[in-house]
A protein has these predicted regions:
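The conserved Walker
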Residues: 13
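Small-molecule kinase domains that catalyze NTP-dependent phosphoryl transfer to phosphate-bearing small molecules
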Residues: 108-111, 116-164, 171-174
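Conserved substrate/cofactor phosphate-moiety recognition/catalytic segment
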Residues: 21-67
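Hydrophobic anchor at the beta1->P-loop junction of P-loop NTPases
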Residues: 9
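Conserved lysine of the Walker
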Residues: 17
Length: 174
């Protein structure tokens, strides 16, 4: 197993970031890695509950998460993070904080798939007009141009996605 790294999963709400990150973290743990898990929803309930969704607040959300990932990394943890990270400027911030230790993983799913999954009911809230600035619908999501890896979750299983990630991120780099 390689040294500790940060695996930063990003994509639209409902793309499967948290589900895939959880499963990937379990696989890493099964192979002896000490994993520290960071999730955007969880941070917004606690550490980042003072932040809204303005451009400045989104950047601060990502910056804080990247700084937390760096602290865990310095303690020898492998970090698995899942954050929407909607714009390239956010992803550049992650790269600037974490440098060579970060693997950016774009979790790609069509907007229709995301709406179908909508476990939090957010897309319904957007359609009702209750949420104004929603990434991918009424707020921008910039398709990545420098991602390290793209994984599509449309029409496939979590297990298949984890196997693909494992092969590309772990096995092929031994």
């Amino acid at each position: 197993m390689e040294k500790a790294r940060v695996y930063w999963f990003f994509g639209l709400s409902g793309s499967g970031k948290s589900t895939l990150s959880d499963a990937f973290a379990l696989r890493l743990n099964d192979f002896g890695q000490h994993v520290f898990r960071l999730d955007g929803d969880e941070l917004r309930k606690g550490v980042n509950k003072d932040l809204g969704f303005s451009q400045e607040d989104r950047m601060e959300n990502v910056r804080r998460a990247a700084e937390m990932a760096q602290l865990a990394l310095k303690q020898g943890f492998t970090v698995v993070a899942s954050f929407i990270s909607p714009e390239e400027i956010h992803r550049e911030k992650v790269r600037s904080v974490l440098g060579e230790y970060v693997e950016m993983i774009f979790v790609d799913a069509s907007i229709d798939t995301c709406r179908t999954r909508d476990v939090k009911g957010l897309y319904q809230q957007v359609e009702k007009g209750n949420i104004k600035e929603f990434t991918g619908v009424s707020a921008p999501f910039e398709m990545p141009n420098m991602e390290e890896l793209r994984i599509s979750t449309d029409g496939t299983t979590v297990e298949h996605c984890v196997n693909v990630l494992w092969e590309k991120l772990i096995v092929s780099r031994k």
